[in-house]
């Protein structure tokens, strides 16, 4: 494979020296970009965009052609695994993701297969290898998956949920059934991420979008335990380089110490944490990624720059910080504001790496 021309993202995750703080954005290939909207219209719908490696590659590279980002992230969806388990993923306009089949009994869970990354999710592996080839060493490629808990909520609720009542009822009424489901999902996520690494992903992130909705005890039992299991089963070195692992639990700021013990190289932070405080708590163990409130991008470029400066100052000197938003960039953001954000990170962070 081609040597990396810009490896500061990987270096920061491994707490090695960098010249400036690296930056990328969750959902950087997304609806805020007119070129993404054009590609999506051409593909027909969101799933066709995900399932066609050429389209997935095209939209992954769009933000990199526009901005000096330090990483690319595979364009896909966290729900590819449940779809490959036979649940029938589809998208309702205005409703988000739905499943044709819902998991409600132990028998449903027993019947679920563990997908084979090559056979059942080959389109994702093809997308990874295509993107990696097209990147030609420009920046590293991030692979990703949803966490077992987050995937389980969609599978049991049948789609998005405000209160996760069915999944939480299962956690308390029938924990053995939920553990069986989470165990199958942990196996599936491990092989899925390892497949992505072998196909060319140079770092991986686990998105635990709904872990922060659990109580502290339930988070340990139903979310963190399974992420720890995945991390211990991942390929950590490939092509002569370490493959860093990032864990991101949205609203998980109260539990950073426990998450930092899970074996990952870095923790993602949402915007409710103060990054300087997070560094004092766990910065000796892990790198940190984040954590500007995505809605700051609706403000004027000068205000965006000011908030970037504040977060950089809060983190302080030295490596171990990858700048990102605290969650995905939203569709209505002006692309110029995203550009102002990225430029501000590079321009204002150099002083912290001298």
Swiss-Prot record:
Molecular function in Gene Ontology: uroporphyrinogen decarboxylase activity
UniProt-listed Enzyme Commission number(s): 4.1.1.37
Bilayer-crossing regions: none
Record-level GO BP terms: protoporphyrinogen IX biosynthetic process from glutamate
Catalytic activity as recorded in UniProt: uroporphyrinogen III + 4 H(+) = coproporphyrinogen III + 4 CO2
UniProt pathway annotation: Porphyrin-containing compound metabolism; protoporphyrin-IX biosynthesis; coproporphyrinogen-III from 5-aminolevulinate: step 4/4
CDD domains: URO-D
Xref: InterPro entries: UROD/MetE-like_sf, Uroporphyrinogen_deCO2ase_HemE, Uroporphyrinogen_deCOase
Major location (coarse): cytoplasm
Family: Belongs to the uroporphyrinogen decarboxylase family.
Function comment: Catalyzes the decarboxylation of four acetate groups of uroporphyrinogen-III to yield coproporphyrinogen-III.
Protein name according to UniProt: Uroporphyrinogen decarboxylase
Species of origin: Pseudomonas putida (strain ATCC 47054 / DSM 6125 / CFBP 8728 / NCIMB 11950 / KT2440)
Top-level taxonomy: Bacteria, Pseudomonadati, Pseudomonadota, Gammaproteobacteria, Pseudomonadales
Underlying gene: hemE
